[in-house]
Amino acid sequence: MKLQEFENSYQKSEQKLQFYQKKSNRLSIIRFCLFILAILVLLIGYFQKKNILYIFSFLYLLLFLYVVAVHTKVKNKLFYYDSLTKVFMQHIQRINNQWDTFEEDGEEFLKDDISIDLDLFGHHSLFQLINATFTYQGKQLLAQNIIHPSLNKDMILKRQEVLNELSEHNNFILEIQTYGKMMKIRDEETIYQFIDSLSQNHYHSMKKYIFIFPLLVLITILCCSFSIALPYSYMLCELAIVLQIIITILFYKKNSELFEPVKKFQKSLNNYQQLFLIIQNEHFQSSLLKELQAKISQNQQAVKGIEKLSRISQAISYRQNILLFILLNGLGLYDICIRYFYINWINDYGTKVQQWFDALAEMELFISLYIPKMDDFLVSQPQISDTMSLSFQNLKHPLIDTQKVVGNSFCLENHGCVITGSNMSGKTTFMRTIGMNLILSYMGSYVFGENMICSCMTILTSMRVKDNVEEGISTFYGELLRIKKMIEYSQFKKPMVCFIDEIFKGTNSLDRIAGARATIKKLSLEHCIFFMTTHDFELCNTQEIDISNYHFDEYYQDDKIFFDYLLHKGQSQTTNGQFLLKQLGII
């Protein structure tokens, strides 16, 4: 969708939001007045002994309850349009390069070398750019796919098919995002606790009493009924009530433990039901979306199951009121009844809940992969090659401002590419551009360029290497470990691509050049592509090994340095180190 479309939709949603806000405010005043009026009329009728006023008080109370029901619907609409407005705003912010303000940046996943080197997680990261998840499972699934993208061509092509279909379902995506935004809680343990609780056996604790409880309820009802006519039955009635309360207390801890997981996300159940209903009612053609939909829509089990669970969780919430708890359990073993219905629900749906939430997480993943296209970035779908290849046109860094980013074109000639150029000229950014776009390719998403052809390759990096005081690892030794990992992986003869920035910068020039030449020789294999940046021009002419030389240039104007950030063939002929030293007054 274009920016103008999002802005128009945002304005319409904002108008709806303001309309329902005003309506909600009016209804709040009306219901307050009706409640006060009902109380006042009741008190006047009581003190002035006018029974007719009791009727009016009752009518005002009924009217109050009606207004409460209407107000609840209005508040639901208000909440919906508030969430929809926020969804539109996020799309607008993403298009306007303001996406790095989004709360979720996946910093907790920033652990491995590649994630750090390629800015996959954390502030201003790939995750922060494309993330459209709203559940813990969805967030985890997206992170897993970024860290370990698929290298299966068939799966990549199936996901591309999914994204092509989603391009015709923008309203569906907006509905999913809106109800996702309405989630009350995001506690990462809540749903897992709930799912884990379903696998436990709770039935045995009440099996021996299953016939006693209904009998006690029946006795209580009969006692209460006959107590009107038979005064001596009061004692039996009281005994039955006390006995039921004792039984309730005995089972209180076990029941509370059973109900706790579902109670935690009770307020989100209606939203989950709506999400499952939206997915169930949509028409899909691609195989992955049909499989996903089948997990949810088979016999409408997800929608029906969550609807029943919502009613049970609502019943569980009444336990919070002490007076209501005593009354309901004294008259009808309320806790035991809820337990009975809940365990029946577990028996009917417990084994299916995991696949429902997994399917929802998968839909969140697909929407996240579609985000670059939906938000009108200049993207395209890559072509996956069966042979070792890498080429692209006008490929851009996904995280750089769309108004400033410069695209580059490339076609692999030799498997080894040595890149030279001045400081800040764009060498490292170019490698990150390729790395991030390859990850997007393998995830089945879009690349920020045109005509990209790539093979499925394991990505290895040596870029942001730092020393580790705790482990006693210097920067140079850290680099050695990274290079060793690449060489060891190359022995498996699986397709791989390596990105090495400023190779062996942590040691002297003599050792650096010797080590770099040895690395080039080790990685010059048919199944390996490597990109290596360096300031050592000696590496541009490596005997007996065919490598391609590329460079980035700078130019000077009015005693200032400028960069075009364009990749050029051949070895760099310029340096800017001394110029920068002079500019800063060091020399």
Q: Where are the regions that the model predicts?
A:
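ATPase nucleotide-binding head domains, primarily ABC-like/P-loop NTPase cores
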Residues: 68, 369-587
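Alpha-helical coupling/stalk and coiled-coil linker elements that connect catalytic or binding modules
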Residues: 1-421, 429-458, 481
